[in-house]
Amino acid sequence: MDTQAVRAYLLDLQDRITTAVGTLDGGTFVTDTWDKPPTERLRGSGRTCILENGAVLERGGVGFSHVMGDTLPPSATANRPELAGRGFEAMGVSLVFHPRNPYAPTVHMNVRCFVAQRPDAEPVWWFGGGMDLTPYYGFAEDAAHFHRTCKQALEPFGEELYPRFKQWCDDYFYLKHRKEARGVGGIFFDDFAELGFERSFEMMRAVGDALLPAWLPIAEQRHATPYGERERAFQAYRRGRYVEFNLVFDRGTLFGLQSGGRTESILMSMPPVANWRYDWQPEPGSPEAALYTDFLPARDWV
């Protein structure tokens, strides 16, 4: 179990993504390297890369963190009560890109490795991650391309993984109180160890490496589409759903806040502008209504 190899991959992934997306945007990611003091309950370090007010990205962040703690927080043991009381080591890369143009979709990706340990027992390790697409104005070809890229990334590890991880994503990124999906989904997995450490690590790398080919061509095609105030207003309204999900349901956000993580880095996923309107409904037959009828309901895209 070579966690240093995982760390090296994650740092390289962060570099590759910020370089490629910075080239698309024309802006520069600001790098914030941080360390948690050894006196805090969560120890470790990380590197947060942020681009704000760019030509393409209104806000985008790519964060790497490598942290350790003496006790797993409740969000990490909710599905694994046998791990309560163990110390842990967690490392990962998490990103969210919020484009300025409402016709360009938001994307989220995360890959992570987790080790729970106790002196009198073998360490328990697993990988998690995935990526999902959140359009404001949907294009079937974009959703199909995104899902096709996810499917191709997973195929070498078993044809059953894509449909399984897609369903997991559809179930996970669902706002129960709104009875609607956050976007058009993608793939999601957690507590994954079934292929053994090396092969599971390889699968996680395939997911991380798929982010750029999955999202970059869509952003390149959509970021210059003409738009007006109506589209920006709808984008801000739908971004409100993103905020609701991240603060109410997202396991990564809850884990970070419950374990004493770095708040600025945890909340870098938040959109720069969002709003709420009381009981707003889209006009029937409008492009805004099409998001609800044609894109948010779960469906097979490939």
Curated annotation (Swiss-Prot):
Keywords associated with the record: Cytoplasm, Heme biosynthesis, Metal-binding, Oxidoreductase, Porphyrin biosynthesis
Active site: 108
Main location class: cytoplasm
Cofactors named for this entry: a divalent metal cation
Keyword Protease: no
Binding site for a divalent metal cation: 98, 108, 147, 177
Recorded GO CC terms: cytoplasm
Subcellular localization(s) per the UniProt record: Cytoplasm
NCBIfam families in the record: PRK05330.1
Assembly, per entry: Homodimer.
Record-stated family: Belongs to the aerobic coproporphyrinogen-III oxidase family.
Protein name: Oxygen-dependent coproporphyrinogen-III oxidase
